[in-house]
Amino acid sequence: GVFLTHGHADAVGALPYFLQNIDAPVFGSKLTIALAKYYVESSNIVKGFEDYHEVTENTEIDFPTATVKFFKTTHTIPDSLAIVIKTSEGNIVYTGDFKFDQSAAVEYQTNFGRIADVGEDYVLALLSDSSDAESTVENVSDRKVAETMLETFLNAEGRIIVACVASNILRIQQVINAAYESGRKIFLTGSELEEIVNIALSLNKLTVPDKELIVNFNQMKKLADDELVILETGNAGEPIKALQKMALGRHRQVNLHEGDLVYIATTPSVAMETQIARTKDLIYRADAEVFEMANSKKSSGHATPNDLKLMMNLLQPTFFIPVQGEYRSLLAHAELANELGIPYKNIFIPGKG
């Protein structure tokens, strides 16, 4: 079977290509399965696949030689799960994307008790998210991010264009809340964003305090600049290219003008620094302003070193395999594991592919 940890495009986007070659059941939480179905159906690569199975952290799936279990993790999308494969030799744990946030909302909370229970049951191997293993700055709570966002929205005099990843449900919820509390309406650009928002709303994973808060294109054009938030996620959930089009006057719905504030609410992907710098330059040339969240608050969806060490201390694995990240991130994670007493001979850094 295929076991999914969460519903972000980078976690489920390859599914249609996989299912094109291998017919296997797909398991995931309710929101994860709903988003997986959306990506598979919209790809037009696989037709008629329906072998989906919803799980919770209390689900146990028995196979002849192993049992698959789960525990809740904190990420920037609800219903995120880590995967535990219980074998006769011990547990094998794959964290998926995760971080720890002690102040997380209920939908995003980590089940620390369950993690400790898995650790007590002996962990043979841990495969853990290495994306932010090199970070020298720890994440702040997302509650602090929400406070900063609201303050920015209240002080902005013109339109606010928020750039974030399409499936970052947590950030979208924060934008919805800040727009409502600052007396603004929201316009969603693009069909992918609308579809993801509708899926999350239908499953009560996203809440809108006023049914008239989200407006269509014609309604947007009638609003004053200080009454509007535009949420831009771009194609394939990548907003930076879309911001460049807005700045150059080439966007099909919204172009930048004087008085606009572009709020970059996404943590740049690895190797995107040059693109971000060029984009900011184009925005300023269009007489707009830029607020980059990453410059004031560190809040990625990935565990920083202290979180990574806490996960290892809770699980106490015999073998450690850092996954997800550039080689230098994997190496940094391996060094953290060694600091905690895991010998290098028990640490394996995999190659890609």
Predicted features and spans:
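C-terminal regulatory/interaction regions
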Residues: 176-177, 181, 200-353
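His/Asp/Glu-rich metal-coordinating catalytic cores
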Residues: 1-3, 8-222, 241-255, 274-277
